[in-house]
């Protein structure tokens, strides 16, 4: 391999190195991890799995620790605009240089072991955080839990936010099967915090099988937060319990905890922008459960609403639409330039006959039309790609 210099060169090379984009299993990445960290990672670890709410829960934890003057690293996925978003230290995303240096360190030790794009990302996150000498790291599971690459690290505490039907090709098509996969992040004699209000029995069974400690959180946080939606109070409660579990190592003052929760913010989770006197809501809700939550938040303010929507073909799109259509007066459908996207023609067939739908040639024309419509509110949702496309254009307004 010739010397790779830029981040784009590294990422293009990784995509071709291991052509199977998703290749679940820990054997390959474990080999390289042990070479990089023979004694384990030098920081506290919180691992977060769950169908929805992971990013918001991480935002709460991140903000609490920053407010308390601890150095915190967060590894999240997918990114919205820039790959570097996946690695943050005290809220600042990693530079191209630091990511390339991490990739270089991995490549030096990798040998003949083939790694996927996501496995490279996971190892790079750990290398970056170790180099930055962070106190605590929050790792977001990319898919499932049991066989996801972040599961090479033994967490000091883990969180399962909730269980809903998603990624059925990989995780199974029942909540019990998906719960089993998420429960794979648990460890014996280590606490796992679960926020699901009706948890599948597979989570408790797995905890019993391995001797993990399991705590169910049912009561939402009652304090002030900036993030909108009742579900965010539940996410905040999970974050509080996680930082409380690490109090001996990373002591948090109650006042700093409250301030951290209130300051927490995250892109594209009912993110509200005002453009040309129109309210625009950006939300990465991309499955039935998340869209139901989005609908509940929209219902808090009953105003004429236009949706800009697109989705991936492996989702249950009929249920996604039916979960929110009572809140939407008009739909603008946009194409996505990713392989997994459903075509606009196939997408239209998922709607009821009474829906008012317009196909737009791209996101720019959809936003132009939305900003000149009679509807007071515009909501952009359906996938990370949909929202990312909108954000790139709205940044120019």
What is the meaning of each model-derived region?
Residues 145-147, 154-211, 318:
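Conserved catalytic-core segment of NTP-binding enzymes
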Residues 365-395:
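A glycine-rich beta-strand to alpha-helix segment
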Residues 56-60:
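Hydrophobic positions on the alpha1 helix immediately C-terminal to the Walker A/P-loop
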Residues 9, 20-21, 26, 30-41, ...:
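ATP-dependent carboxylate-amine ligase catalytic core
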Residues 193, 197-215, 279-280, 288, ...:
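C-terminal helical cap/extension that packs against the catalytic core
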Residues 131, 136-141, 149-159, 163-167, ...:
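Nucleotide phosphate-binding/pyrophosphate-handling subdomain across enzymes
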Residues 46-48:
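Hydrophobic anchor at the beta1->P-loop junction of P-loop NTPases
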Residues 1-20:
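Charged, amphipathic alpha-helical linker segments immediately N-terminal to NTP-binding catalytic cores
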């Amino acid at each position: 391999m010739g010397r790779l210099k830029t981040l784009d060169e590294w990422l293009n090379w990784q995509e071709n190195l291991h052509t199977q984009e998703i290749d679940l299993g820990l054997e390959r990445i474990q080999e390289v991890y042990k070479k990089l960290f023979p004694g384990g990672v030098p920081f506290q670890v919180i691992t977060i799995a769950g169908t929805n709410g992971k990013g918001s829960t991480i935002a709460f934890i991140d903000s609490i620790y920053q407010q308390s003057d601890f150095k915190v690293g967060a590894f999240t996925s997918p990114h919205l605009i820039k790959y570097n978003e996946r690695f943050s230290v005290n809220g600042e995303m990693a530079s191209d240089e630091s990511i390339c240096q991490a990739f270089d360190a991995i490549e030096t030790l990798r040998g003949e072991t083939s790694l996927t794009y996501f496995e490279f990302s996971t190892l790079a996150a750990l290398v970056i955080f170790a180099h930055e000498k962070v106190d605590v790291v929050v790792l977001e599971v990319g898919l499932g839990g049991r066989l996801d690459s972040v599961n090479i690290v033994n967490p000091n505490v883990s969180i399962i936010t909730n269980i809903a039907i998603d990624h059925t090709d990989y995780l199974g098509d029942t909540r019990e099967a998906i719960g089993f996969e998420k429960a794979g992040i648990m460890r014996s004699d280590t606490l796992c915090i679960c926020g699901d209000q009706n948890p599948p029995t597979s989570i408790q069974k797995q905890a019993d099988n391995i001797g993990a400690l399991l705590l169910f959180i049912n009561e939402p946080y009652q304090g002030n937060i900036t993030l909108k939606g009742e579900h965010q109070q539940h996410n905040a409660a999970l974050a509080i319990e996680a930082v409380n579990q690490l109090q001996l190592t990373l002591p948090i003052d109650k006042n700093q905890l409250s301030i951290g929760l209130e300051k927490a913010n995250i892109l594209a989770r009912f993110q509200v922008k005002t453009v040309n006197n129109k309210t625009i809501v950006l939300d990465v809700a991309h499955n039935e459960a998340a869209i139901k939550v989005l609908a509940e938040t929209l219902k808090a303010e009953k105003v004429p609403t236009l949706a800009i929507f697109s989705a991936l073909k492996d989702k249950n799109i009929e249920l996604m639409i039916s979960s929110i259509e009572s809140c939407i007066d008009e739909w603008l459908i946009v194409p996505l330039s990713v392989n997994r996207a459903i075509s606009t023609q196939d997408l239209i067939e998922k709607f009821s006959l009474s829906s008012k739908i317009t196909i737009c040639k791209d996101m720019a024309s959809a936003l132009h039309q939305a900003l000149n419509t009679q509807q007071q509110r515009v909501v952009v949702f359906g996938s990370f790609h949909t929202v990312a496309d909108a954000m790139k254009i709205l940044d120019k307004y």
